[in-house]
Amino acid sequence: IFFAAAGWEKACAILGRLRLDSAALLQKRGKLTVRHDDWKFLWVIDFPLMSYDEAENRYVATHHPFTAPVAEDAALLDSNPKAVRGQHYDVVLNGMELGGGSIRIHQPALQKKVFEDVLKIPAEVVESRFGYMLKAFTYGAPPHGGIAFGLDRMVALLCGTTSIRDVIAFPKTQKGQDLMAQSPTPVTERQLKELHITTVIPE
């Protein structure tokens, strides 16, 4: 039995990582057999719209700030934002996330409330960054949403590998380098000047 002493989200992340590492170790030692031809799908729904950031002392969006709350939970945005479920969803296959998406907020008043009252973004910042969107919503935007799938993850599962680097034609290294194209390559001073970028190389 394992115990984790931390905040709920951090404890879950630690124990989840421990579960995966333990399974990998047992498999390596021949104590556990993982079948790659047994497909177990799972939809993750109803997870919190907001998470509390202790460092910033405020709520942050669990998925993104445009995710719509579950209708019957919307009233809790004022009193208990952490209890509000979001209309976001992930599809998982054999423990690997294949895709995720959400239903978006389409009412200007609700979006403004999320920005200013819950996320504590100053009104002037909201107006400068998202004013165009809030105005567009006043013309009657319909409910909308979507989902994005990771085809590379699907192929990795079909091939029985745990790393998408094994199935990508030109995978990058952990440092973001493309070994085939030898990129990234150094940029010239002229290119940096055109983009008004100054670099400071550590000694």
Where would I find each of the regions flagged by the language model?
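Structured aminoacyl-transfer and RNA-binding surfaces used for tRNA recognition/handling
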Residues: 1-203
